[in-house]
């Protein structure tokens, strides 16, 4: 199995702080896991501890580009398991689970809100903003530490365009992407690019030519592709169609000796 490559050029990206902080035992696990992940070139996304069917400690991680392959999960598990055994943050038996953020992933860093501009999100505020705590809409990026979304659940006034909301980044309690066809297609493309890059780094595939690498970078910066709208079929039962059909019927039923 191919070993995932270390990403030395992304050390700054891995050090970007998260906007969420887990409470209690999850916070202790995060304090142990985060340095190990950063040392391998990954970023911590979220810690979740559940007691169903025994205790499970789920550590959600990612590469700085937002992807996470199976080989990456295995590498993190192999490096983190002995560290967790020594630190022993949980005073009972547990199962360690390393996973990717998933397609409808949580947004936990400022760069997440920038990377997924153009996608549908759900946001919950720590305190009410403009009389409400929950928002849903299309992410429009960040400006002056305010997350901008175009809401799809409200209108500024009847007959107008959907209302915009500007939410303070520091007041966001949780945020995650909403599963759409557009998001699925984008995630699959990112996954294919990550797998190809892994094989290129391992020497299994030849490196891409400079123009192909540049095109890939420009495509990532461009954000999600706009869905193509199918052209509506032309109507086939208009007045012109009916008149033409009627004239054709009159020609076929007319007397062939007429005019002689």
Swiss-Prot record:
GO biological process, one term: ribosomal small subunit assembly
Positions with biased composition (Basic residues): 228-242
Source species, domain of life: Bacteria
Name the record gives this protein: Ribosome maturation factor RimP
CDD domains, sorted: YlxS_C
Gene name of this polypeptide: rimP
Function statement: Required for maturation of 30S ribosomal subunits.
Chain residue ranges for the region called Disordered: 189-260
Main location: cytoplasm
Cell compartments where the protein resides: Cytoplasm
Cytoplasm among keywords: yes
Origin organism lineage: Bacteria, Pseudomonadati, Pseudomonadota, Alphaproteobacteria, Hyphomicrobiales
Biased segments, Basic and acidic residues type: 189-199, 215-227
Protein family (similarity comment): Belongs to the RimP family.
Pfam families noted in UniProt: DUF150_C (PF17384), RimP_N (PF02576)
HAMAP family registered for this protein in UniProt: RimP
GO terms under cellular component: cytosol
InterPro entries reported in the protein's UniProt record: Ribosome_maturation_RimP (IPR003728), RimP_C (IPR028998), RimP_C_sf (IPR036847), RimP_N (IPR028989), RimP_N_sf (IPR035956)
Record's keyword terms, sorted: Cytoplasm, Ribosome biogenesis
């Amino acid at each position: 199995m191919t070993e995932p490559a270390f990403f030395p050029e992304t050390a700054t990206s891995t050090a970007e702080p998260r906007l969420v902080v887990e409470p209690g035992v999850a916070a202790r696990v995060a304090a142990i896991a985060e340095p190990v992940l950063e040392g391998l070139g990954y970023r911590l996304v979220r810690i979740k501890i559940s007691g169903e069917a025994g205790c499970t400690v789920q550590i959600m991680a990612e590469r700085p580009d937002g992807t996470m392959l199976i080989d990456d999960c295995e590498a993190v598990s192999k490096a983190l398991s002995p560290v967790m055994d020594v630190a022993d943050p949980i005073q009972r038996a547990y199962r360690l689970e390393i996973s990717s953020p998933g397609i409808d992933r949580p947004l936990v860093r400022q760069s997440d809100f920038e990377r997924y501009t153009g996608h549908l999100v759900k946001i919950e505020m720590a305190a009410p903003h403009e009389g409400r705590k929950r928002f849903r809409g299309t992410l429009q990026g960040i400006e002056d530490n305010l997350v901008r979304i175009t809401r799809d659940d409200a209108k500024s006034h009847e007959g107008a365009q959907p209302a915009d909301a500007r939410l303070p980044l520091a007041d966001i309690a949780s945020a995650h992407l909403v599963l759409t066809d557009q998001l699925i297609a984008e995630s699959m493309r990112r996954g294919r690019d990550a797998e190809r890059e892994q094989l290129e780094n391992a020497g299994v595939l030849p490196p891409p030519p400079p123009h192909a690498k540049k095109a890939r970078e420009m495509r990532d910066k461009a954000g999600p592709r706009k869905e193509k709208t199918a052209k509506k079929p032309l109507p086939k039962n208009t007045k012109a169609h009916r008149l033409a059909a009627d004239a054709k019927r009159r020609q076929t039923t007319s007397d062939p000796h007429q005019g002689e």
